[in-house]
């Protein structure tokens, strides 16, 4: 992220977050369609819902809660969510070796790194200096399991993809709330 106006930094970060969230949602759907029998999907989704590491972070759970937090807090939460996936996504390309939707899986890590850098640039702008490591936890998710013949591995990956999708949705929401708060525009209704 070269030096640019704050509005451009926010616009770029939101676009990157939206793209990653859509990629995560498409990947989740493709994995589900390919590996999870239709009759099991709903019950598995409910069972997996409680296992997202991000649920242990005291972060806002929706747009209304996000609006109660400062921009710096929202950036820190977004950064934490993004960083928690940097390790696990490096294994995604092995899980989706012959996937059409996930043909770009090798680039997911780079896209996450770009978003991480964009969030750090926003933090520098808003904090007038370098981002403080502060409360950034270094906890992360497990790696994706590349053994797709095992039911346990399939369920683990399904749960991880569900968490990945949820976490990217949260990061996108936080960035959009901040952008709308600072730069009122027609695309703020979401």
From Swiss-Prot:
Taxonomic superkingdom = Eukaryota
Q: Where does Zn(2+) bind?
A: 19, 172
Purpose? Plays an important role in growth control. Its major role in stimulating body growth is to stimulate the liver and other tissues to secrete IGF1. It stimulates both the differentiation and proliferation of myoblasts. It also stimulates amino acid uptake and protein synthesis in muscle and other tissues.
Q: Can you list the GO cellular component terms from the UniProt entry?
A: extracellular space
Subcellular location(s): the record lists: Secreted
**In this chain, where does the modification Phosphoserine occur?**
105
Keyword check for Disulfide bond, yes or no.
Answer: yes
This one is known as Somatotropin
User: What's one GO MF term for it?
Assistant: hormone activity
Q: Which UniProt keywords apply?
A: Disulfide bond, Hormone, Metal-binding, Phosphoprotein, Secreted, Zinc
What's the family?
Belongs to the somatotropin/prolactin family.
Gene this protein is translated from: GH1
* PANTHER family, alphabetized: SOMATOTROPIN, SOMATOTROPIN,PROLACTIN
**Disulfide pattern:** 52-163, 180-188
What CDD domains does UniProt report for this protein, alphabetically? Answer: somatotropin_like (cd10285)
Tell me, which GO biological process terms does this entry list?
animal organ development; growth hormone receptor signaling pathway; positive regulation of growth; positive regulation of receptor signaling pathway via JAK-STAT; response to nutrient levels
